Amino acid sequence: MDEATQRQDPIEETDAEKKVQVVPSLWGRLVSNHPESRHIDLIEHSIFFGRNPKRCQVVLHDPTVSGIHCRIFREEIPCQKYNNNNNNDGDNNNNNNNNNNNNNNNNNNNNNNNNNNNNNNNNNNNTTKNYITKITDTSSNGTFVKGCILGKDKTTIIQNGDMVSFTSAKLISSLSFTFLDLTNPYIDEPFEEEMNKKYSIQGILGTGNFSVVKRCIRRDTGEVFAVKIIDKKKFWSQTKTRRQMESEVEILQKIKHPNIISIIDIVQSDRYFYIVLELATGGELFEKIKQKGRFSEPEAKDTFKQILEAVSYLHDLNISHRDLKPENILISAVSHGKSSVIKVTDFGLAKIIGEKEMATTLCGTPLYVAPEIIRNCLHGDGGAQVNTGYGKEVDVWSLGCILYILLSGRPPFDFDHTNNFNLKLINQGLYNFSLPVWDVVTENAKDLIKKLLNVDPTKRISTKGALSHDWFNDDDLLRCSTVIANQSPISKSPQRSHGVVQLPVVDVKSKNIPMTLNSTTTNTTSPNNNNNNNNNNNNKNNNKNIIKSLNSNSNNYNNNSVLKKTSQSPKTKSNRPKLQFEQPSPNQHNNNNNNNNNNNNNNNNNNNNNNSSGGKPAIINNNGNLYSKFMATNNDPFDCTPTSTPVKPITNSTTTSTATSMPTSNSVTMGTSSTSIPVSNSITMKSPSILALSDDGDKKRKEKESSSSENVNDVIVINSNNHNNNNNNNHNINNGISSKPPPKRLKGS
């Protein structure tokens, strides 16, 4: 039957077609690796993914996704079934057909046709439909398969457990999925049929001496778990290990706590023992410590309290973990606005301890092992002493080591496998808080560590006592937000870079009162301010565009930053502010000269105030806003608070020859290359060369200040008045002022 006939048959049987409806079945699923993303069911044989809703069955709302990002489709492949009976029947038919061919030529063609039909029937009976799944990348930014970018117009086969990501190679992302083939009954690993009916086994998460932990997906719900697969052949003859495994299962079945990995399912077969566990996708606490170097005290308190509550719950059930360490503490995926949830896992060494029963098995990690275990280990070989065993107190010691690491990024005892010197340090409890990182840790935290790391197990604090410690009631931890150098043994501590400190914005244009950065002086105004303002109002239009540009460093001072450093270095001249000004009109020269003469007396009276105030450096951004570099009160450059009290302007140039004054006469004088800048209020600025906290800048500043006391002519006012009235300008130089009308607005604001 040709293709045209196949297309016409459904048209002739329209009524019958309405009675029969073929519903596509679910053949695959993309299981989301992110807790807040949903799964994607694969029903059609060819599915397009992308941002274009008209051409894609699955629309992905992400700016990095292309219109047609990729295509996932299935291809049918034949799979032969070997049947000996059918093969023998086919051979007999072929022999009979050959005999008929010898007898009659006319029947030969018929027999050949029948023979071909029989062969076709045999082939149809011996084949079954099977599919492979492929993915084609059609995107610009790339589609990631198993962590590697596929490449545009390239196709590859995806199998059970392969990770497919549409945006990045990261495992946990909003568009990262794990492919699950629901129709293929075969998997690569030789796992039991009962387990395969319920779960799809995928990549390895961890390995042990007798078990392997893998990722698994429940087929009916798509939920992701971790399964611990134990091969019975490796331990079934070992009584001690067998009891240990049975004890672990018994413990896990009893535990129900939000901070402990819970057991989901148990499947046992002749060969394997499967323990399906809750999966924490946030990684290990050990990796988080390596990444951060150390935790702030509030973070450490929140994390350690969850660990302590989990261990206390175990101890209430008369259970000891025996192997507490950051590697066995997992972090669940963090949702937006929620704190991370800690999960204690790996009970491979845990046992149920009776009231009169004490375990004497040496176990645990040496870095977190308790002194009583060390004593038993050191005296066990010689047989001089009988092992006294140990109980739940070993978990408390391990908790003390974990808290020490959280707050410092370093272990309390560095273990060396070459000798037992460090074991003696553990046995004697020789640790200290000498690192600089401990300077900002509260005494309550240190006291809790001391009680947890008590070498005498009888005097060691319990988990209940630790939860009621004063450290968990101490909420005054604001000073712990200070930036501390990274003390992690993994990475070196970064060098502190000198930069400009940013403070909250002070808008000098919004008020009509003079303002400086010294909050200790009182508010006084010049009696000639009104005259200056009246004269300057006539020339507002001429100076409307006085400031054409300011240095690019002002872009770093934004309104949202309170205390932030910049990476720009102002040591070179190219980084200093470059100012461009327009020449004032000739009529303005005379007005400015008169104003300058009137202001000389007032400025001379303010010399003493200027000497005592020590004017603070400031910055004006393109919007005309004032930014203070330092407003320290206790000689601490990082104790910065914005001034709110208007004070008297500082205008004495004899003590600030390298500084810039912005008096009420609406001008600014900047250092040896200063220029008059019209502003609306009075502030004091130092030279931009001082704004960088560098050694070179401090040295140059001191040289300029020493030279300024001898020659006040180092302060030069770039003004067109200089060539007209030198005498007046000399007075202006000595007083560090210059008069210009204020602009109506700053250009570029």
UniProtKB/Swiss-Prot annotation:
Gene3D superfamilies from the UniProt entry: 2.60.200.20, Phosphorylase Kinase, domain 1, Transferase(Phosphotransferase) domain 1
EC number, UniProt record: 2.7.11.1
EC main group: transferase
GO BP, sorted A to Z: DNA damage checkpoint signaling; DNA damage response; mitotic DNA damage checkpoint signaling
Any one GO cellular component localisation term in the record: nucleus
Extent of Polar residues compositional bias: 562-572, 668-687
Binding site residues for ATP: L205, G206, T207, G208, N209, F210, S211, V212, V213, K228
UniProt biased composition (Basic and acidic residues): 696-707
Residues covered by the FHA domain: 47-150
GO molecular function terms noted in the UniProt entry: ATP binding; protein serine kinase activity; protein serine/threonine kinase activity
Keywords, alphabetical: ATP-binding, Kinase, Nucleotide-binding, Serine/threonine-protein kinase, Transferase
Low complexity: bias regions: 84-126, 516-561, 590-611, 651-667, 708-739
Annotated region (Disordered), positions in chain: 84-130, 512-620, 640-749
Protein family according to the UniProt entry: Belongs to the protein kinase superfamily. CAMK Ser/Thr protein kinase family. CHK2 subfamily.
Listed name of the protein: Probable serine/threonine-protein kinase fhkD
Organism name: Dictyostelium discoideum (Social amoeba)
